[in-house]
Amino acid sequence: MTYDFTSLMDRHDLDAIAVDLPGTPGFSITAPKEGFDVIPMWVADMNFPTVPTIPAAIVERTAHTAYGYFAPRAEYFDAIIRWHREHNGVEGLESRHIGYANGVLGGVVAAANVLCSRGDNILVHSPTYVGFTHALGDIGYNLVHSELKLDEQGIWRMDFADMEKKIVENKIHCAVFCSPHNPCGRVWEKWEIEQAMELYKKHDVFVISDEIWSDLILEGYKHIPTQSVSEDAKMRTVAMYAPSKTFNLAGLVGSYSIVYNSWLKDRMDKEIALSHTNAMNVLSMYALIGAYKPEGTVWLEELREVLTGNVNFACDYIEKHFEGVTVSKPQGTYMLFVDCSSWCEKHGKTMDDVLAACYDVGVAVQDGRHFHGACHMRMNLASPLSRIQEAFDRLDKYVFNA
């Protein structure tokens, strides 16, 4: 490989909540017992160094020691347009369709504010990304959950009949669509997106499509942009993207929307501006330009190979060694949504017991109940394989087969 995905990074005391927050007073993930270090498997960032073109772009810009007011450079828009054309086959994207937001959730909230009034019902799929729950629910929107169903092959599927029932009964005119899905890792097929968008068209539902994970597709699968499935989908969808998940840039904060509907785009721009806190950071602009270079594509291809290997290892290990623990193998993202229901029932344990045992040995997973998983945990696999192997060895010895 051209890039290093095997060395262990020491992120302690370097502004990484993934490793520094566990064990702090009041935080749900407690400190491990003596003899164990923390393996960060909860928050969705990576324990890999990013592609070198990003720090190079930032360093080059910081060498010019004036950081005053600025407007986004043409290179910024050109990089986004080129990336979507080369990676997703998108044609016709222009700079006028691209808007800035301080984080994808900020863009989701802005779009909801444009399309809804506080107190309105918004459709989401369950399991539900906890960020939607807080960003929308905490400011007065009512989230209506349509549960995803596992088919006979163990693949998460949308329940279109339930979606329509919920839309009609709750007078819904806005839906949040997560593609790929977090936490389940589903990469939706074209026919699934088409059917969902036809349903939304039928009932005049606008769509906010969170596609921040769209670059992190595992081998054998392909991301289909929501706006690409029909002309109507193109015009009724606000799509949110960012280089942050792809290139481990969450701390730099810099996301963007793609909106083709000029009526909707104008209102999005106004809503974003009204906060007076949503201006682009000059260094995040250069980070995106650095990320979306050809080197970024090579780095991403290698990362996807590593993540595919990690997912294969983890899912195989669970199937062979953890009786009563199940997982639907993700097709994208680097997260597992692990179901411990049968194991807990057989052993007379609760999810609290499982999490406490994990934390005792430093396996810092995330409580899946925050995502509407009754007896689940969400597990981050974006670390060197040796670290993933160590985590599963601890789970084997001290948690599920203790």
Ranges and model annotations:
Residues T2-G103, A110, P294, A402:
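N-terminal small-domain helix-loop-helix segment of the aminotransferase-like
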Residues Y67-L199, D215-E219, H223-S228, D232, ...:
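Conserved core of the PLP fold type I
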Residues E211-W213, A242-P243:
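Short strand-turn motif at the edge of the Rossmann-like AdoMet-binding core
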Residues A233, K346-T350, A356-Q366, H370-A402:
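PLP-dependent enzyme catalytic core of the Aspartate aminotransferase-like
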Residues R236-K320, T326-P330:
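PLP-dependent aminotransferase class I/II
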Residues L307-T308, H321-D360, M377, L385:
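Conserved PLP-binding catalytic core of the aspartate aminotransferase-like
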